[in-house]
UniProtKB/Swiss-Prot annotation:
Job description of the protein: Catalyzes the NADPH-dependent reduction of L-glutamate 5-phosphate into L-glutamate 5-semialdehyde and phosphate. The product spontaneously undergoes cyclization to form 1-pyrroline-5-carboxylate.
Organism: Campylobacter jejuni subsp. jejuni serotype O:23/36 (strain 81-176)
The protein, known as: Gamma-glutamyl phosphate reductase
Keyword set, alphabetical order: Amino-acid biosynthesis, Cytoplasm, NADP, Oxidoreductase, Proline biosynthesis
NCBIfam families the record matches: PRK00197.1, proA
Gene Ontology BP terms: L-proline biosynthetic process
EC number: 1.2.1.41
UniProt GO MF annotations: glutamate-5-semialdehyde dehydrogenase activity; NADP binding
Main location as per UniProt: cytoplasm
Metabolic or biological pathway, per its Swiss-Prot or TrEMBL entry: Amino-acid biosynthesis; L-proline biosynthesis; L-glutamate 5-semialdehyde from L-glutamate: step 2/2
Residue ranges that the Swiss-Prot or TrEMBL entry lists as coiled coil: none
Chemical reaction(s) catalysed: L-glutamate 5-semialdehyde + phosphate + NADP(+) = L-glutamyl 5-phosphate + NADPH + H(+)
Disulfide bonds: none
Annotated compartments: Cytoplasm
Length: 410
C-alpha cells in the first residue's frame, strides 16, 4: 500500500504540468465516454440495485438511470469550462522592504474521498480533481461496487490516454481503506461522505485531517411576517422534492401567531405525499383530524435526519427562539427563514452558525451545481478550510510567492 500511495504522490506532479486547455480536453473526453457508454453503467447499476435489499434514502442515492447519467455528463462539461484555479493570484502587495508578495492557489495534494452509495461521485470527483490538479484515491461503498467499477474503468481509460492513470486509484475493500488511514505522511486530507457513524469511525482511526460532511439536519423557520403562499412553495420543495438528499428539510419551525393558518395550508399538500408529522406538543392540536400520521415528538425527534417523507414540527414565539432551537439541534448544514421582516432576516443570517443560511428560498439549493461550481466533492459542515458546497477552489490551498532584488532582513 505504501508503495502504491508513494507512486501516486510522485506522479501527481503530472497534474501540475497540465495547461487549462489540457484539463478542459480531458474532462470533456470523460463526459463523452460516459455518455457513449451509459448502457454499460446502467447494467452494472442493475446488479447493485438487485443486491441491495434495503429501502429508503440510500436506495435512491444508489440508483442511476439514463436521465441521471446525462445530467452527470452535463455537470462534467460545466466543470471543464470553469476557470482553472491553479496558479491563480488572489492578491499581491509590496512590503516595507520592497518585496513583492503574492498569494497563489495550489492543489491540496493527495486527497482520499470515501463515499457511500452515489456512484456518480466516481466521475464527478475525478473531474474536480483533474481540474484542481489533485491526485486522489477513491473508496466507494460496497453497495455500489459494480457501478463504481464500471464508471472508474471508463475514467481510467481516459486517464491512460493522457498518461495520468498513476495519479488516481480506486479501492473497493474495507480493509484497504483501514490501511490508507495510517498513511498521514502521504495523504493530505480525507473527505468522507456518508453516515455520521462512518465519519466518526474514520475520525477515530486516523491522524489525517478530515473535511467532514455531517448529516443534513436542515431547518426552516416561517416567520410571522412571511408570505404564506411563498412559504408553502418553499416548504414543499425543501421537504418533498427529493427526501433522500442531505439538503432536504427535516425540521419546520412556525411562528405561533400564524400556526393555524399556515398548517391549514400545509395539510392538504402533505396528504399528497403522505408526510408523517413528528410534532412538538405545542403543535399537535393543529394536526387533529388531518388524516396524516402524527407522532408526538420525543427527546430524539429534533436531532433526527429523517431522509424520508417525515418532518419534525414545532411552534416558536419569535425569531430568537427559532435561532436558539436551530443552534442547539443543527448539523451545521443548511437553514432557511421565510420572512418579510428585514431585521429578523439579518438576525437569522448573522446568528446561526450553519454553512448555508437562506432567506426566502429552499434549502435544496445547497449543491455545488446549483451554486455554479459545476459539481461538488461534498458539502462541508466543518468550520476549518471549507464550508458548504465544496467546488474546485475548496480543494485548493495556497502558497506565497515572494520576489526580491537582493533584500536582506536587518
Amino acid at each position: 500500500m505504501r508503495n502504491l500511495l508513494e507512486n501516486i504522490k510522485k506522479n501527481s506532479q503530472k497534474l501540475l504540468n497540465l495547461t487549462p486547455k489540457d484539463k478542459e480536453k480531458i474532462i470533456l473526453k470523460l463526459a463523452q465516454i460516459l455518455r457513449e457508454n451509459f448502457k454499460i453503467i446502467l447494467e452494472a447499476n442493475k446488479k447493485d440495485m438487485a443486491n441491495f435489499t434495503k429501502s429508503g434514502a440510500m436506495k435512491d442515492r444508489l440508483l442511476l438511470d439514463e436521465k441521471r447519467i446525462l445530467a452527470l455528463c452535463e455537470g462534467l462539461e460545466k466543470i471543464a469550462y470553469i476557470e482553472d484555479p491553479i496558479g491563480k493570484i488572489s492578491k499581491g502587495w509590496k512590503n516595507y522592504a520592497g518585496l513583492s508578495i503574492q498569494k497563489m492557489s495550489i492543489p491540496l495534494g493527495l486527497i482520499c474521498v470515501i463515499y457511500e452509495a452515489r456512484p456518480s461521485l466516481s466521475a464527478e470527483i475525478a473531474a474536480l480533481m483533474i481540474k484542481s490538479s489533485n491526485a486522489c484515491v477513491f473508496k466507494g461503498g460496497s453497495e455500489a461496487k459494480f457501478t463504481n467499477e464500471a464508471i472508474f474503468t471508463l475514467v481510467n481509460k481516459v486517464l491512460k490516454e493522457f498518461d495520468l492513470q498513476d495519479c488516481f486509484a480506486m479501492f473497493t475493500q474495507r480493509d484497504e481503506i483501514l490501511q490508507i488511514l495510517a498513511f498521514d505522511d502521504l495523504i493530505d486530507v480525507i473527505i468522507p461522505r456518508g453516515s455520521s457513524n462512518m465519519i466518526q469511525e474514520i475520525a477515530n482511526n486516523t491522524k489525517i485531517p478530515l473535511i467532514k460532511q455531517n448529516k443534513g439536519l436542515c431547518h426552516a423557520f416561517v416567520d410571522q411576517s412571511a408570505n404564506l403562499d411563498m412559504a408553502l412553495k418553499i416548504i414543499l420543495n425543501a421537504k418533498c422534492q427529493r427526501v433522500s438528499v442531505c439538503n432536504a428539510l427535516e425540521t419546520l419551525l412556525i411562528h405561533e401567531k400564524i400556526a393555524k393558518n399556515f398548517i391549514s395550508l400545509l395539510i392538504p399538500e402533505f396528504k399528497k405525499f403522505k408526510v408523517k408529522i413528528h410534532a412538538h406538543e405545542n403543535a399537535l392540536a393543529y394536526f387533529n383530524n388531518s388524516n396524516l400520521k402524527i407522532f408526538k415528538a420525543n427527546e430524539n425527534t429534533f436531532d433526527t435526519e429523517w431522509l424520508d417523507f417525515a418532518l419534525s414540527v414545532k411552534l416558536v414565539k419569535d425569531c430568537d427562539e427559532a435561532i436558539e432551537h436551530i443552534n442547539k439541534h443543527s448539523s451545521l448544514h443548511s437553514e432557511t427563514i421565510i420572512s418579510n421582516d428585514a431585521s429578523n432576516i439579518a438576525k437569522f443570517q448573522r446568528l446561526i452558525n450553519s454553512s448555508c443560511i437562506y432567506a426566502n428560498a429552499s434549502t435544496r439549493f445547497s449543491d455545488g451545481g446549483e451554486f455554479g461550481f459545476g459539481g461538488e466533492v461534498g458539502i462541508s459542515t466543518s468550520k476549518l478550510h471549507a464550508r458548504g458546497p465544496m467546488g474546485i477552489e475548496d480543494i485548493c490551498t495556497y502558497k506565497y510567492i515572494i520576489n526580491g532584488e537582493g533584500q536582506i532582513r536587518e
